Each structure stands twice: as structure tokens, then as C-alpha cells.
Amino acid sequence: MISEERLLKILLSPHVSEKTSISMEKFNTVVLKVLNNATKYEIKYAVKKIFDVDVDSIKTLKVKGKKKRQSNRIIQRSHWKKAYIKVKKGCNLDFIGNTE
């Protein structure tokens, strides 16, 4: 069993881009930024508990931080983890709040 405190820390924010909005409409998939050390089981459990939806599948990947240049220094941004969460048909997990 996962503690309530850990559940609330696993899901960081929705990842909104052109690609994610298309996948949300076509494939009923939501993309979230999650903790680097979160497992698929923890992510699935957190989504079920917090949003009360049925999860069909989860795919995760780690995104490497970009190197940015500031004057004469090179700074690397933090690495982060992204989760593609496919929600079962009939369930809706909409962060943007489209009213149609």
C-alpha cells in the first residue's frame, strides 16, 4: 500500500503540447510529468485514487534535460520522467477544461 503523502507527490503536472493534445483526442491518452523514481504501478494507483478513472495502460520514458548557454557558461536542465496514461473508454481525464 502506498501512503497518501507519496500518492500526492507522484503526479507533478500535465504535459501540454501539440502532440499530447492530439493523442488525448484520438487515443484517449493523457501525458503527465511524474517523479523520476515513480514506478508504473505507483502512477496507475495514484491516477485511480486521485482522479477516480480506470487506467488501461501506462508507458513511461525519461526525458534528458537540455543544455542551455548563458553568456560563457553551459547549464544543463534537470532530467524528468513522462508518463503516457491510456484511460479506458467512457472515462475522461481533462486538465485543460474544454467546455463544448
Swiss-Prot record:
Subunit comment: Part of the 50S ribosomal subunit. Contacts protein L29, and trigger factor when it is bound to the ribosome.
Statement: the UniProt record of this protein carries the keyword Protease: no
Organism: Buchnera aphidicola subsp. Acyrthosiphon pisum (strain APS)
UniProt GO BP: translation
Annotated GO CC locations: ribonucleoprotein complex; ribosome
Keywords: Ribonucleoprotein, Ribosomal protein, RNA-binding, rRNA-binding
Protein name, entry field: Large ribosomal subunit protein uL23
Signal peptide limits: none
Pfam families: Ribosomal_L23
Role: One of the early assembly proteins it binds 23S rRNA. One of the proteins that surrounds the polypeptide exit tunnel on the outside of the ribosome. Forms the main docking site for trigger factor binding to the ribosome.
Stored SUPFAM superfamilies: Ribosomal proteins S24e, L23 and L15e
GO terms, molecular function: rRNA binding; structural constituent of ribosome
Record-stated family: Belongs to the universal ribosomal protein uL23 family.
